[in-house]
Design a protein with these regions (language model features):
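A cross-family glycoside hydrolase active-site/sugar-binding cleft signature
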Residues: 55-59, 92, 117-119, 142
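Active-site-adjacent beta->alpha loops and helix N-cap segments on the catalytic face
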Residues: 94-108, 121-129, 143-157
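Alpha/beta enzyme core
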Residues: 70-89, 111, 130-137, 151-154, ...
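Active-site beta->alpha loop and helix N-cap motifs at the rims of alpha/beta catalytic domains
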Residues: 116, 120, 127, 133-134, ...
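Conserved small/polar residues in nucleotide/adenosyl-binding loops
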Residues: 165-167
Length: 167
C-alpha cells in the first residue's frame, strides 16, 4: 500500500463523517454565503508583470519532516507572508498527515487580502463545496491521487472559481 493509498483510505472515511456532521445541502448554503472569491489566477498573472508570483505555504507538519513549527500561528504567518510580498497563500488542511486544520484556511485568509488555496487531498465534490464554504479561492487537485473522471468531477464542481491541477 502506497502513501497515497493510505491517505485515500482515511480521507474517504473523513468525508463520510463530515457529510454526517454537515449535510451536502447545508455545506452548499455555507458556500453560497462565503465571502467573494479572490481571483488566484489573476493575482499570479498580475505579479508576473513585476517578475514572479509567489505562493506561500502555511504548513504545520509533513509526513517526512514531522512538526515543522511549534509556534504555529496561521494568521501571523499569512500576515508575514503578505508583508513579505507573497502573491497567494496555500494552506494545508489535511490533519492526519500534515497536522492541518480547516480553521487554518479560514483564519489565514481572513487575516490578509491574498487569495488562498485549500491544499488537501480531494476525492469528493463535497470537499470542493466545503473549500468554498471555508472561503477558499482555489483548490488543488492532485492528479496522482484521483482518476481522470474524478478530476473532471472535482474541476466541474469548482467551475465558478479557480482550480489548479497538480500532476
Amino acid at each position: 500500500m502506497t502513501i497515497l493509498d493510505t491517505i485515500k483510505e482515511y480521507k474517504l472515511k473523513e468525508i463520510e463523517k463530515d457529510k454526517k456532521i454537515i449535510s451536502v445541502s447545508r455545506i452548499e448554503e455555507l458556500a453560497k454565503a462565503a465571502s467573494p472569491v479572490r481571483n488566484f489566477y489573476a493575482a499570479i498573472k498580475h505579479a508576473q508583470k513585476d517578475g514572479y508570483g509567489l505562493i506561500a505555504e502555511i504548513k504545520k507538519a509533513s509526513p517526512s519532516k514531522g512538526l515543522i513549527r511549534e509556534d504555529f500561528n496561521p494568521e501571523k504567518l499569512a500576515t508575514a507572508y503578505e508583508e513579505g510580498g507573497a502573491t497567494c497563500l496555500s494552506v494545508l488542511t489535511d490533519k492526519p498527515s500534515f497536522m492541518g486544520d480547516k480553521d487554518f484556511l479560514t483564519n489565514a485568509r481572513k487575516s490578509t487580502q491574498l487569495p488562498a488555496l485549500r491544499k488537501d487531498f480531494m476525492y469528493d465534490t463535497y470537499q470542493v463545496t466545503e473549500a468554498r464554504a471555508l472561503n477558499a479561492d482555489c483548490i488543488l487537485i492532485i492528479m496522482a491521487s484521483v482518476s481522470d473522471q474524478q478530476a473532471e468531477e472535482l474541476e466541474h464542481a469548482a467551475v465558478s472559481w479557480l482550480s489548479l491541477i497538480h500532476i
